């Protein structure tokens, strides 16, 4: 929550990966970053984090990096329009894009809690990877399953299959 509410402490970072930002909250770790760090913003995030929880944050907690913001912002669950395109359709129907050099574009599903920008397609500034099994487990209401039947002219046969859609 603190990372989402304050300005990004990783200045000039071309990627939106929430996991990298959470690494800065791990106890005893001061991860290296190739990007300029706004130390004051980082200290505010750390202070807010300490106020919100008495639990020690560990690297095992990073596995929930996509699920937790998706629970808070289910309308920001996103699926890539096409592989590696960087353009995503959010569950609220809005199309948003990652910046061109954002490594997060390799993921089919994301939670994009920070999306900003005016114009035709807003930009995703903060995102976390989600997997299809995570979505099926934690958000079954977003998965629609139906039977599809398509006639195949080449084989003169009816092909029937189950299709899942987010």
Question: What are the residue ranges of the model-derived segments?
Answer:
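Second RecA-like catalytic domain
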Residues: 1-166
């Amino acid at each position: 929550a603190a990372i989402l509410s304050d300005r990004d402490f990783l200045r000039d970072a071309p990627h939106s990966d929430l996991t990298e930002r959470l690494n800065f909250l791990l106890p005893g770790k001061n991860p290296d970053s190739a990007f300029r760090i706004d130390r004051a913003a980082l200290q505010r995030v750390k202070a807010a984090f300490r106020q919100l929880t008495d639990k020690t944050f560990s690297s095992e907690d990073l596995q929930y990096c996509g699920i937790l913001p998706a629970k808070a912002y289910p309308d920001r669950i996103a699926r890539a329009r096409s592989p590696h395109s960087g353009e995503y359709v959010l569950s609220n129907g809005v199309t948003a894009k990652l910046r061109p050099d954002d490594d997060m574009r390799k993921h089919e599903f994301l939670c994009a809690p920070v999306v900003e920008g005016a114009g035709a397609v807003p930009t995703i500034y903060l995102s976390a990877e989600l997997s299809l099994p995570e979505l099926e487990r934690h958000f079954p209401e977003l998965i629609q399953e139906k039977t599809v039947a398509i006639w195949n002219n080449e084989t003169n046969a009816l092909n029937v299959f189950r299709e899942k859609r987010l």
